[in-house]
Amino acid sequence: IEVDKLFDDQIRFTQKLTRFPSLRGQEHTAQDFLFDELTKRNYALDRWTVNVEDIKDHPGFSPVKVDYSNAINIVGTHRPKKEMGRSLILNGHIDVVPEGPYEMWSRNPFDPAIEGDWMYGRGGADMKAGIVANIFAMDAIRNLGCLPAARVHIQSVVEEECTGNGALACLVSCLLYTSDAADEMRRG
């Protein structure tokens, strides 16, 4: 029931996030928005630019020839006063694939529209709605007054559509983001 109370807000939040054209190398404005929203929710926050030097020797690394100066990952962490139980990582990627020829769209791909039960907009389903679902699941739990007794990390990473290096950068930072379980929200 608490999730239902937040549903309209969650839809509006998803629309707002989908308006950011977070193509490869242009994710930073969407990440800024998420950082601000997680700050309002009192998460402990980390933000850093993905550094190829930190991940290039990892077997999961994919070589890149693009500039990572705007490849910013963010992590919001719920930290309980007294940590007990098992921790959790909720991971999602903020980057979207290019929209392709504009004339092939019946509407602006970065101005999400709702028709019936469907939202149309580039990146809405893959995977901005997943990131938003992670945030609003924690909102619902908090609104019930049932704060998790363990750390919960909400990760928004870049560079999933091409290489996965954004999630790898979070993995390599495992001293900060260890957990007993991890999930990447997928529709289906």
Indicate residue ranges for each PLM-predicted region.
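Acidic/His- and Gly-rich active-site-bordering loop/insert found
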Residues: 1-119, 143, 147-148
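Glycine-rich, phosphate-binding/catalytic loops in enzymes
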Residues: 105-109, 170-173, 185
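Predominant activation on well-ordered alpha-helical scaffold segments within soluble catalytic domains
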Residues: 15, 35, 132-139, 168-171
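Alpha-helical metal-binding/catalytic segments enriched in His/Glu/Asp
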Residues: 90, 114-161
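Single conserved hydrophobic/aromatic residue that forms the stacking wall/gate
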Residues: 177-188
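Generic structural signal for helix capping and beta-alpha/helix-loop junctions
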Residues: 54-55, 162-164
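Short acidic, glycine/serine/threonine-rich loops at helix termini
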Residues: 102, 164-169
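Structural signature of cysteine-dependent C-C bond-forming condensing enzymes
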Residues: 145, 172-176
